[in-house]
């Protein structure tokens, strides 16, 4: 669907042109506003409350209309704190939904839900803006070709490949490398696809958002010298913000991504961390609006809200939005309505394992738990599919044998099983890879590995051609040629020591 971005000056135009109302009631972040008869705003219109609070401070609170109550009243949800608001304050109907800046001006900057920069780097060019509420692209505009989105990360491309224009769920606890994986993907898409990324921090910790920003500056994803050369736009609505802001910040990020897809005709990567917080904020707003709760206390409109966000994340004939969404699973219950509703929209899952992280294997992607609908012979080809299946079978057999090894030791295994274990350990290490964004910490240069190289490497390990090489030769290398070169270096080093 083509965006028609508006070319306009920033802010609200003169009061005389707009409908004016008055605040009639305030309950937390929810405001009831009375308008003159025949001057009612539409659902999703942005309202601006202007005036002074009880101590004379200037107030400027933006709200979004959610319900028409009758008796010339509307109920709106505030996008920022409502402290200091009083009944009788003047409310301006802007006559349109919330609009945010889009285009190249957003790159390298941090925004809040309203599209206002919050990084103290000065104003942003707001001549090109776009409303955050839009319908999903029409069916006829969708690109239905199934194509793989190559990330340059071996474990992802081989075992759980991403779909171009697809949605990926990223499951992982604290400290297993979600942020580093996200940053590497942003870096790789910028280099290999010339694309841009948009990061939507939905209800996340402020500290994490700050850490991500600092790490992006360190790794060069955000270019401090020439901000326009940056490859990412950041939109944050943290945990401490009102539910209205957390509910809409995902749409703000998506709107920026849609512009890059539809107008600039680029492939865009959209990160949402965390999609569960989007549902949680919707649940809070639903309760504040007085709707009857549904299963487990969630909003009755859960599927509709999730669908309206997810259906806009798609490939069109112009470009694609590939979305990677961190998914928090409450109490590890996958049947909870929030993750269950999210699963229905995902094309692939990337599960990060604490066990692999503890072994020092990064990225700590669990090769057996991660899944993808793209791993089918008719999509990825027979060679890729067969290699992936054999890798999984080898790793699965190793997993089954681990109890026996722990109790009896390797010597008690049959010759065939010992060979399987040796190859599985090589595969496990070869699934690790040095990242560009981790260069500053590890000192080893990052590697982008093409899909063909990845398949060739694993085929050589499975065929037994590399059985003579030590397993540490496969740890943190790019392609298989680097592993053989590393093995030769290790051999030379060991001879020198003797």
Swiss-Prot record:
Produces ATP from ADP in the presence of a proton gradient across the membrane. The catalytic sites are hosted primarily by the beta subunits. Its EC number is 7.1.2.2. Belongs to the ATPase alpha/beta chains family. Coiled coil: none annotated. It comes from Trochodendron aralioides (Wheel tree). SUPFAM superfamilies: C-terminal domain of alpha and beta subunits of F1 ATP synthase, N-terminal domain of alpha and beta subunits of F1 ATP synthase, P-loop containing nucleoside triphosphate hydrolases. It is an enzyme of class 7 (translocase). It is found in: Plastid, Chloroplast thylakoid membrane. This is ATP synthase subunit beta, chloroplastic. It is a peripheral membrane protein. F-type ATPases have 2 components, CF(1) - the catalytic core - and CF(0) - the membrane proton channel. CF(1) has five subunits: alpha(3), beta(3), gamma(1), delta(1), epsilon(1). CF(0) has four main subunits: a(1), b(1), b'(1) and c(9-12). ATP binds at residues 172-179. GO terms for cellular component: chloroplast thylakoid membrane; mitochondrion; proton-transporting ATP synthase complex. The keyword Chloroplast applies. It catalyses: ATP + H2O + 4 H(+)(in) = ADP + phosphate + 5 H(+)(out).
């Amino acid at each position: 669907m083509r965006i028609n971005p508006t070319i306009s000056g920033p802010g609200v135009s003169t009061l005389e042109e707009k409908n004016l109302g008055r605040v009639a009631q305030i309950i937390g972040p929810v405001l009831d506003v009375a308008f003159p008869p025949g001057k009612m705003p539409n659902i999703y219109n942005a309202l601006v409350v202007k005036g002074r609070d009880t101590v004379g401070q200037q107030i400027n609170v933006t709200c979004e209309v959610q319900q028409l109550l009758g008796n010339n009243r509307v109920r709106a949800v505030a996008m920022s704190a409502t402290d200091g608001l009083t009944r009788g304050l003047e409310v301006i109907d802007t006559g349109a939904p919330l609009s945010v800046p889009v285009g190249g001006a957003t790159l390298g900057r941090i925004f809040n839900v309203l599209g206002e920069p919050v990084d103290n780097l000065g104003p942003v060019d707001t001549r090109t803006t776009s409303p955050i509420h839009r319908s999903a692209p029409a069916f006829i505009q969708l690109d239905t070709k199934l194509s793989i989105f190559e990330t340059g990360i071996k474990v992802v491309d081989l075992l759980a490949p991403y779909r171009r224009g697809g949605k990926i769920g990223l499951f992982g606890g604290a400290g297993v490398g979600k942020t580093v994986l996200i940053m590497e993907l942003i870096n790789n898409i910028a280099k290999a696809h010339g694309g841009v990324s948009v990061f939507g921090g939905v209800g996340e910790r402020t500290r994490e958002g700050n850490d991500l920003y600092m790490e992006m500056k360190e790794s060069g994803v955000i270019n401090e010298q020439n901000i326009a050369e940056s490859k990412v736009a950041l939109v944050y609505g943290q945990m401490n913000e009102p539910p209205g802001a957390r509910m809409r910040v995902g749409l703000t990020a998506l709107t920026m991504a849609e512009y890059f897809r539809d107008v600039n005709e680029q492939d865009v990567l959209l990160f949402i961390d965390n999609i569960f917080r989007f549902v949680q904020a919707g649940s809070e707003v639903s309760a504040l609006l007085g709707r009857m709760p549904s299963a487990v206390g969630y909003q009755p409109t859960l599927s509709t809200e999730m669908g309206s966000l997810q259906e806009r994340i798609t490939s069109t004939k112009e470009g694609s939005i590939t979305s990677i969404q961190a998914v928090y699973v409450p109490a590890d219950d996958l049947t909870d309505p929030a993750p269950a509703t999210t699963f229905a929209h995902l094309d692939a899952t990337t599960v990060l394992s604490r066990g692999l992280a503890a072994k020092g294997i990064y990225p700590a992607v669990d090769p057996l738990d991660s899944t993808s609908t793209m791993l089918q012979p008719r999509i990825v080809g027979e060679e890729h599919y067969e290699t992936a299946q054999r890798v999984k079978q080898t790793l699965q057999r190793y997993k089954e044998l681990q109890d026996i090894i722990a109790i009896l030791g390797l010597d008690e295994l049959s010759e065939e099983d010992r060979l399987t274990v040796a190859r599985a350990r090589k595969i496990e290490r070869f699934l690790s890879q040095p990242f560009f964004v981790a260069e500053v910490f590890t000192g080893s240069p990052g590697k982008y590995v093409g899909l063909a190289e990845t398949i060739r490497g694993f085929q050589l390990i499975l065929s037994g051609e590399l059985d003579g090489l030590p397993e540490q030769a496969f740890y943190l290398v790019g392609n298989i040629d680097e592993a053989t070169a590393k093995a030769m270096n290790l051999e030379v080093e060991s001879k020198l020591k003797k």
